Amino acid sequence: VYIMILPAFGIISEIIPVHSRKKIWGYKFIAYSTLSIAFIGFLVWGHHMFTSGQSVFSQIVFSFITYFVGIPTGVKIFSWILTMYKGQVSFTPPMMYALSFLFLFTIGGLTGIFLGAVALDIHLHDTYFVVAHFHYVMQGGTIVAFLGGLHHWWPKSFGVMYNQTVANIAALGVFIGFNGTFFPQFLLGLRGMPRRYATYDEQFVELHSYSTFWSGILGISIFIAVMNLFWSFIKKNKVDPGSNPWGGMTLEWTHTSSPPHPHNFEEDPVLQHGPYDYDK
């Protein structure tokens, strides 16, 4: 999980400063926290085995290390929030997905603290609480960030622009549908509903019904988002070769055409500013 989320962190760290028109806050802190998460990710595997008969000492060690992941993760969250603070935030499709990521991944991270505590994990292990936590981190984190990245670099990569109104509606649908699908599963887990069961007690039917309904909304929203991207090919809504719709200042936006040439640059680029110097 920790390794798969790292590329998403990079995407979000690119989207937020561009669409906030502000230099990213704490660049070095974000970079070092990424290395920290990559390292700590190799040391926390034991928190999945609290119910397997581990020694008390092992449980304490793995629980402590698991909590440690929250420090560099919190550094990233607060750095992104401070980047937006007093910035010129534009609610473009990429930014909508970035904001969704911040909310969903934060919930995923906070609920992971419960599973890192031995006393709580004994009761929550292999319940729907784990299912909800996992999806808030993986889908609410990795996939939502990936969708944001697609919408951010789509006009640059393919030279066509999608319908931004439809993209924003789809992004909102993904956010609402996702929470409607997986938040009830936290409640199911807290009530003792085990995962991997096709049949279950009547007391769980109502929450399962909510989750099933909103999963349809989530699926439809993702379908609309993807089809909107591919429709831009069919409609051939081409952008100007030198187009920079988001006002990005990194090399792919300032020194390449849309889409880029096979070797990116027609000539050696001359740097006249930093990649995030929006205040200059």
Language-model features and meaning:
Residues 1-280:
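Membrane-embedded and interfacial regions of multi-pass energy-transducing membrane proteins
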